Regions:
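Glycine-rich dinucleotide-binding loop and its adjacent helix/turn
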Residues: 1-28, 32-34
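FAD-site-proximal beta/loop scaffold in flavoenzymes
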Residues: 2-15, 104-150, 162
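Cofactor-binding loop segments of dinucleotide-utilizing enzymes, especially the Rossmann-like FAD-
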Residues: 10, 26, 48-50, 145
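Short secondary-structure boundary/capping segments
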Residues: 12-15, 35, 58, 91, ...
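A conserved FAD-binding loop/helix module that cradles the flavin
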Residues: 31-33, 143-175
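Gly/Ala-rich phosphate-binding loop of Rossmann-like dinucleotide-binding domains
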Residues: 38
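A Rossmann-like FAD-binding core segment of flavoenzymes
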Residues: 41-127, 172-175
Length: 175
């Protein structure tokens, strides 16, 4: 992700200080970031022509202190220590210490080719697993970003440990 564009407020929100945090909407999922990030600093939600907030959503954002900017983003200009500049199509420029995005997940076709059951998450399709990381296909286990919408190294390592344990048990005991 680099040093100034992020996907997870829990992983990176605290690193940015108190000023100039941006959320670039790619879908309505940006509301999640727009409501969460004010805990870490002054936040602007750039609607980016991706969705139109409802009156209720606008009230929620206002209550959290999130500023809203309309219009489409044109480009992101990288800077050094300071952060980035988000340049809008109409020429407005917003200096930011960091920018959050909520991209959709795109799975490899392998799980579907194996016949694994998939499920829709807020960020895209993931492989459905149980607590032991087993998929709907006996002997096939999934972990990390393929089986969890929240992209996190910590979760991936924990899920991987469980999938490894479960795979070994499956090979030994047929369960």
């Amino acid at each position: 992700w680099g040093k100034r564009v992020f996907h997870c407020p829990y992983c990176h929100g605290y690193e940015l200080g108190k000023e100039g945090i941006g959320v670039l909407a790619t879908s309505e999922l940006a509301m999640h970031h727009g409501l969460m990030l004010p805990d870490w600093g002054a936040t602007t939600l750039f609607v980016n022509d991706a969705f139109e907030p409802t009156a209720e959503q606008l009230a929620q954002l206002k209550a959290r202190g999130t500023h809203i900017e309309y219009g489409a983003a044109a480009r992101l200009v990288s800077q050094t220590e300071v952060g980035v500049e988000l340049v809008m199509q109409d020429g407005r420029v917003f200096p930011l210490v960091g920018l959050f995005v909520a991209p959709r997940i795109h799975l490899s076709p392998l799980a579907a080719q194996l016949g694994c059951e998939l499920e829709e998450s807020p960020m895209g399709c993931i492989v459905k697993t149980d607590a032991m990381q087993a998929t709907s296909i006996p002997g096939v286990f999934a972990c990390g970003d393929v089986a969890r919408a929240a992209g996190s190294v910590t979760f991936a390592v924990a899920d991987g440990a469980m999938a490894g344990l479960s795979t070994h048990r499956s090979l030994m005991f047929g369960c």
